[in-house]
Amino acid sequence: MRVVVVGAAGQLGRELVRVLPPAETVGLVRDDLDLHDTGAIAPTLAALAPDVVVNASAENRVDAAEDDATDAVAVNAVAVAAMARACRGLGALFVHVSTDYVFDGRAGRPYTEDDAPNPESAYARTKLAGELLARSLAPRHAVVRVAGLYAHGGSRGKGGSFIDRILAQAREGRPLRVVNDQITAPTWARDVAETLARLLPRLRAGQAPSGLYHVTNSGACSWYEFARTALELAGVRAEVGAVSTGELGARAPRPAYSVLANARLAALGEPALRPWRAALEAYLAA
């Protein structure tokens, strides 16, 4: 099973390339495929003759998209449509990675794959558009929603992962202020990658249906609790100030509660991903 990972320099992309069989995996970074050049997408993928294409790329500068969504639309929607069409032509499975931000956060309980999305930011609207395009244009597909993703090296667009930034600021003695009114399920990208490594062959063989899949570590916490736990586990002493989302003055709205329930994974008999604290501890030890 030949797998092409688009966005192989990103948090999840790097982990996918790490866990998938090297002889059967091709990772594409921006120098290999610029997603703003939609005309290059189909021929690039066709030349690689994939059985599966995983789109782990995203334009995820959430606040910047409120001012100008051009890049977000191009990468999160237009390029997704081009990849989905290419996969349809190749008879390949298309796996597209999306986000918990497609929900408005008002449910007050974990969202399942059956819950209706209601994105409130420009970024989130482009991500939902990508989901809909992937599902409508690629007959064989899986849209995988993740939440609070982190990995070693982090997101280049955000200056590293949340954990990397928190630990660096604490060690430098800089003040830490973290929101305490956004509840999510922080998720180590490696755990998502290992789950997908098991799921891809089942999807490819038709043993798992096309559709939506939530893939996150279990449990829930605020970003404030997550930061304090990271410092505790890393043995770094620092004061963390709890602030509200409103106090931070972010331009884009964020869901107050965006915990995802991995209902469809459970229905397939897939093991639950470990609790977020256990994943964080393993991440810090890796």
Predicted segment positions?
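NAD(P)-dependent short-chain dehydrogenase/reductase
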Residues: R135-T184, R190-R198
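C-terminal amphipathic/interface module of NAD(P)-dependent oxidoreductases
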Residues: T229, P255-A286
